[in-house]
């Protein structure tokens, strides 16, 4: 048997043995203490299902999108060392223009206003 196949079989065997032990070893019998919610040592005061602000959700999505675009700019110092630094400058300018246009669009749509 090859080394890779032996490793796969050994890993699968160890995983199955550990899963079998984890399934049969603890005899969990649910009681009131185990089924009660735990919140910093206190009983919960209210429902955990609070209304979620859609404005906060939109701000979080905008942050993720703009953060991703900024992450595209991180390898620029290495891109300037390529054979064609002009293409790096062109792509950098394109990304920055798209980022700026997206920010202006969200600004005019009122997506950056936290309170109305």
Swiss-Prot record:
EC number of this enzyme: 7.1.1.2
Topology term for the membrane: Multi-pass membrane protein
TM annotation in the entry: 8-28, 56-76, 88-108
What's a Pfam family in this record? Oxidored_q4
Cellular component GO terms, alphabetical:
mitochondrial membrane; NADH dehydrogenase complex
Return the InterPro entries for the record. NADH_UbQ/plastoQ_OxRdtase_su3, NDAH_ubi_oxred_su3_sf
What are the entry keywords? Electron transport, Membrane, Mitochondrion, NAD, Respiratory chain, Translocase, Transmembrane, Transmembrane helix, Transport, Ubiquinone
Its subcellular locations are: Mitochondrion membrane
Q: Which molecular-function annotations from GO does this UniProt entry contain?
A: NADH dehydrogenase (ubiquinone) activity
The chemistry this enzyme catalyses reads: a ubiquinone + NADH + 5 H(+)(in) = a ubiquinol + NAD(+) + 4 H(+)(out)
- Looking at its record, which EC class is this enzyme? translocase
Described function: Core subunit of the mitochondrial membrane respiratory chain NADH dehydrogenase (Complex I) that is believed to belong to the minimal assembly required for catalysis. Complex I functions in the transfer of electrons from NADH to the respiratory chain. The immediate electron acceptor for the enzyme is believed to be ubiquinone.
Q: Which family does it belong to?
A: Belongs to the complex I subunit 3 family.
This protein is called what?
A: NADH-ubiquinone oxidoreductase chain 3
Q: Which source organism does the UniProt entry give?
A: Scyliorhinus canicula
């Amino acid at each position: 048997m090859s080394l890779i196949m032996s490793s796969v079989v050994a890993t699968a065997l160890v995983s199955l043995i550990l899963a079998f032990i984890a399934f049969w070893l603890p005899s969990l019998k649910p009681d009131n203490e185990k089924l009660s919610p735990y919140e910093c040592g206190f009983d919960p005061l209210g429902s955990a299902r609070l209304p979620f602000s859609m404005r906060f959700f939109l701000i979080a999505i905008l942050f993720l999108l703009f953060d991703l675009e900024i992450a595209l700019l991180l390898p620029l110092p290495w891109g300037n060392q390529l054979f064609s630094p002009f293409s790096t400058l062109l792509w950098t300018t394109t990304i920055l223009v798209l980022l700026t246009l997206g920010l202006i669009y969200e600004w005019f749509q009122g997506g950056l206003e936290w309170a109305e």
